[in-house]
């Protein structure tokens, strides 16, 4: 069993290395875009943030920031957002990969809460303890699903982490390739460093909300 597990781990690592090379090429081909968030996207973010703030107030969560992931947005555009409750605005934003399982495509993720599905899961999460990651900046945060659509997240090893080859800038109209995520929200190293700094400074748990 151990040998089989190690072979699988090596294979996954090789696949991700190949994907990394492809992402570098993507970033070179893509048209660079500004850091501004389109008005339509920001309006929906603000609506979600208002609902998120109410949830945080009611459940004793952090009321400085929340993390919002809008999987209805094209994968070549920023769709992970750090929302500043006090400033009522986006503080940081990143590209975000979705899971590749159950016939997900680059343009259309399939969502599932089932172990072994390699799918992203919709719903609210509590961002929990900081731990080592072999990907990105070598840090990840455990996630606990708070709804029926994602309550298997912890035992599925769904975590918030980064991946070094993920571009810092938007690659639209190109999509991010499949294979980067097995269900985890995967973001850029640059934004992960900023997220890590925020989380280390906060005492109360931070809300992460994935929706489409």
Regions found by a protein language model. Name each.
Residues 3-17:
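N-terminal Sec-pathway targeting helices
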Residues 27-182, 189-206:
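Cell wall/extracellular polymer interaction/catalysis modules
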Residues 18-27:
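Hydrophobic alpha-helical membrane-insertion segments, chiefly the h-region
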Residues 206-212:
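Charge-dense polyanion-binding interfaces
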Residues 2-3, 23:
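Coiled-coil-like amphipathic alpha-helices with heptad-repeat character
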